[in-house]
Amino acid sequence: SDYLQLAR
């Protein structure tokens, strides 16, 4: 769970 993944 990365904050970069939810930004995709």
UniProtKB/Swiss-Prot annotation:
The modification Arginine amide is found at R8. Belongs to the FARP (FMRF amide related peptide) family. FMRFamides and FMRFamide-like peptides are neuropeptides. It comes from the Eukaryota. Keywords: Amidation, Neuropeptide, Secreted. GO terms for biological process: neuropeptide signaling pathway. It is found in: Secreted. This is Extended FMRFamide-2. Its main location: secreted. One of its GO terms (cellular component) is extracellular region. The keyword Membrane does not apply.
